[in-house]
UniProtKB/Swiss-Prot annotation:
It is an enzyme of class 3 (hydrolase). This is Lon protease. Belongs to the peptidase S16 family. It holds the Pfam family Lon_lid. It catalyses: Hydrolysis of proteins in presence of ATP. The gene is lon. CDD domains: RecA-like_Lon (cd19500). The keyword Isomerase does not apply. Changing S675 to A/T: Loss of activity. It is found in: Cytoplasm. Homohexamer. Organized in a ring with a central cavity. Oligomerization is Mg(2+)-dependent. Residues 589-769 form the Lon proteolytic domain. One of its GO terms (molecular function) is sequence-specific DNA binding. Its main location: cytoplasm.
Length: 779
């Protein structure tokens, strides 16, 4: 730095002056005093520095006075030129009213190669930005600057830099650092400018295109009018819709509503989005089959043949469809109208575990009726508008799934399958299940009104088939409107027949095989059903058959001489691996305190093991296994009954004055319901007496404090599960005996089903004799 010298100082509030800049300064009292002092001084210079709120400025610019005059508004001003940076020292005294400070000039070192490289990079960015703005005079001026420091200080004129950035440039004495800052700031601004210019160009191009399209449409309309294709009241599109409405077979109210919308279309501006909304609505209305109905087939023999060909078993559903056809055929033949004046529709809910054929049954029903078939998946639907549609005030509004299904079917009397209705949810957008109340109510659905159409749609001719896994998840008001048909799963004989008649031929064909090349014995099929799947349906059964066919196809491809292949029971380990399910009831109940119960889940019936144990400690009852409130109460009732009737049951009361623990595996699965009462009593008595429960026995029923066995639900599913689990004796409540009429005969033949009224009788029959327990204990 040079020697210190004393100069008058002028602090500016809003401006930053860098070396090389020529700027006007309005002369207020302080500025005039500083300018006068500078002109009177020997050097003729003054220091211009920014006024900072938080600190005293460290650097300023020594400036010379170029001219004194007036601004266009008449105010006095001085034009100054920044000459050199200076470091500001302490204040001092001087002549006149001006403030004086001591300063030291900052001298720039000779530029290095790195400095020149940075200067070249910055100049390239600066010239690119100036050329984009067509500032060619400034381009010429910048090209003439060779000093890197002077080039960097031209940024004082840059409008895209903030006051803080310019002040940082003023205080940065290192030229390399100054150029690096400017390269970053200018590069960012240039990129932002390019994006803004691109957006502006896109907007301008879009506006020009829109104006061009508008002009061409006006010219096209004028040409068509001259050719006589239009009258003075239409615009082409509206007349086209009028003609389509007149030709369409529409109900009178629908025709009137459509013509009103055409009138709105004629009055709508071409630039208004309303025109597009009206056209979409008119297209939707005209595409619906308002008066189109297919003729039902009333051939009962043909219907039975179709249903039996596609599905094995399911007699309840098949009988209901045949009854429906019989009524449909008999009423017109006798000149009788449908009761109540409603249409020919029906609403049935097919409830059962997965894989029993509920969804595929819908297509078979449609074929049997000679009707169109449409499937509507409801799983995961949470928006009421999915059912009723969106109101036309919303952008992108569409009709609901019911209206779209009718349009897709092309008739007003299709078979509509509403799949997985128990998976419907609800949130802030409404409850789809509540919207289905009107759809599935035969007394109301002849005037179903979709929000989008806002017209009455007659759904009374539609056959609605609804599928569900868990009936309890369907709202009671909705379930009340439907005819319930429960499909409880297949027996072992059913699965064998399905595999031989449906699954095996299909998977053999998919594997490119024939019956001459690969066969599966009946024993192998029964083994797969019993030890590899153990499911109510046949989905996993079919997957395993597909796996076996793939392995057989691979074997034949590697060794063609291996044909024909016969897969028998001993060969299953080679094709399917080891069995996944083995009879375990005998193993589970091999110790006292374990009883086998029966339960119903969303996947059908299943066995439920209840374990009881006792330990030293304060008397009490501990329950584990994620039990629900009802099941916890059943455990309390069972414990109270055993305590009260200990003598009759042969239980030592002291054995119950311990810490009793009841556990229901699996612990990660929530469980609830009253039907485990008798099983809990049996497990407690077995634990207290040391007598094991017979391994081939299962039981179900609710128990009272007096030991009465009350009826429960799901008898058919539970007996099917007992057969799959390899049980031979099942105890059920006496009042559930009428439910045995619904159980397949082969299941009843395989099981010894004993209706009981008193839990004491169940205990006497289910527990091993006392002398056997004593012998086992001694051994």
């Amino acid at each position: 730095m040079a020697e210190a010298k004393t100069v008058p100082v002028l602090f500016l509030n809003d401006s930053i002056v860098l070396p090389g800049m020529v700027v006007p300064i309005e002369l207020d009292d302080a500025a005039r005093a500083a300018v006068d002092a500078a002109r009177a001084s020997e050097s003729g210079e003054l220091l211009i520095a920014p006024r900072l709120e938080d600190r005293y400025p460290a650097y300023g610019v020594l400036a010379s006075i170029v001219q004194i005059g007036r601004l266009p508004n008449g105010d006095a001003a001085a034009v100054v030129r920044g000459e050199r940076r200076a470091h500001i020292g302490s204040g001092t005294s001087g002549p006149g009213a001006a403030l004086w400070v001591q300063v030291e000039e900052v001298t720039d070192p000779e530029p290095t190669d790195e400095t020149k490289k940075l200067a070249g990079e910055y100049k390239k960015l600066l010239l690119a930005m100036l050329q984009r703005r067509d500032a060619w005079q400034i381009v010429d001026m910048v090209n003439k600057i060779t000093d890197p420091s002077a080039l960097a200080d031209t940024a004082g004129y840059a409008s895209y830099l903030t006051g803080t950035q310019k002040r940082e440039l003023l205080e940065t004495t290192d030229v390399d650092r100054r150029l690096s800052l400017l390269i970053g700031w200018t590069g960012d601004h240039l990129a932002e400018t390019e994006v803004n210019d691109k957006i502006a160009e896109d907007v301008r191009t879009g506006m020009e295109k829109q104006q061009k399209e508008f002009l061409l449409r006006q010219q096209l309309a004028a040409i068509r009018k001259e050719l006589g294709e239009l009258d003075d009241n239409g615009d082409g599109s509206s007349d086209d819709y009028r003609a389509r409405i007149e030709q369409a077979d529409l109900p009178e109210k629908v025709r009137e509503a459509a013509l009103r919308e055409v009138g709105k279309l004629e009055r709508a501006s071409d630039q208004s989005p309303e025109g597009g909304w009206i056209r979409t609505w008119l297209d939707t209305v005209l595409d619906l089959p308002w008066n189109v109905r297919t003729e039902d087939s009333t051939d009962l023999a043909r219907a039975r043949e179709i249903l039996d060909t596609d599905h094995h078993g399911l007699s309840d559903v098949k009988d209901r469809i045949v009854e429906y056809l019989a009524v449909r055929g008999a009423a017109p033949q006798r000149g009788m109208a449908v009761v109540g004046g409603r249409g020919s529709g029906a609403v049935m809910v097919l409830a059962g575990p997965p894989g029993v054929g509920k969804t595929s049954l819908g297509e078979s029903v449609a074929r049997a009726l000679d009707r169109k078939f449409v499937r509507v998946a409801l799983g995961g639907v949470r928006d009421e508008a999915e059912i009723r549609g969106h109101r036309r005030t919303y952008v992108g509004a569409l009709p609901g799934r019911i209206v779209r299904a009718i349009g897709e079917a092309g008739s007003m009397n299709p078979v509509v399958l509403l799949d997985e209705i128990d998976k419907v949810g609800s949130d802030y957008r409404g409850d789809p299940a509540a919207a289905l109340l009107e759809v599935l109510d035969p007394a109301q659905n002849h005037t179903f009104r979709d929000h989008y159409l806002d017209l009455d749609l007659d759904l009374s001719d539609v056959v609605f088939l609804v599928t569900a896994n868990v009936i309890e998840n369907i709202p009671s008001a909705l379930l009340d409107r439907m005819e319930l048909v429960e499909i409880d799963g297949y027996t072992a004989d059913d699965k064998l027949a399905i595999a031989q008649g449906f699954l095996l031929p299909r998977q053999r064909e998919r594997g490119g095989l024939t019956s001459d090349e690969v066969t599966v014995t009946e024993a192998a099929l029964r083994k797969i059903a019993a030890d590899y799947t153990r499911e109510p349906g046949v989905r996993q059964f079919e997957r395993l058959l597909a796996k076996a066919m793939r392995k057989a196809a691979t074997k034949l491809a590697d060794h063609p001489q291996a044909a024909p292949i016969t897969i028998d029971e001993p060969d299953l380990v080679e094709y399917l691996g080891r069995p996944r399910f083995l009879p375990e009831s005998a193993e589970r109940t091999a110790v006292p305190g374990v009883a086998t119960g029966l339960a119903v889940t969303g996947l059908g019936g299943d066995v439920l093991y209840i374990e009881a144990n006792s330990t030293e400690g304060e008397p009490g009852l501990q329950l584990t296994g994620q039990l629900g409130d009802v099941m916890k109460e059943s455990a309390q009732i069972a414990m109270s009954y055993v305590r009260a009737h200990a003598k009759q049951l042969g239980v030592d009361p002291e054995a119950l004055n311990r810490r009793i623990h009841i556990h229901v595996p699996a612990g990660a699965v929530p469980k609830d319901g009253p039907s485990a009462g008798v099983t809990m009593v049996t497990a407690l008595v077995s634990m207290a007496t040391g007598r094991k429960v017979r391994g081939d026995v299962g039981m179900t029923g609710e128990v009272t404090l007096n030991g009465r066995v009350l009826p429960i639900g799901g008898v058919k599913q539970k007996l099917l599960a007992a057969q799959r689990a390899g049980l031979s004796t099942v105890f059920i409540p006496q009042r559930n005996q009428p439910d045995l009429d619904d159980v397949p005969a082969d299941v009843l033949d395989a099981l010894d089903v004993r209706p009981m009224t008193d839990v004491a009788d169940i205990i006497a029959a289910a527990l091993e004799p006392a002398h056997e327990a004593s012998t086992a204990a001694a051994a």
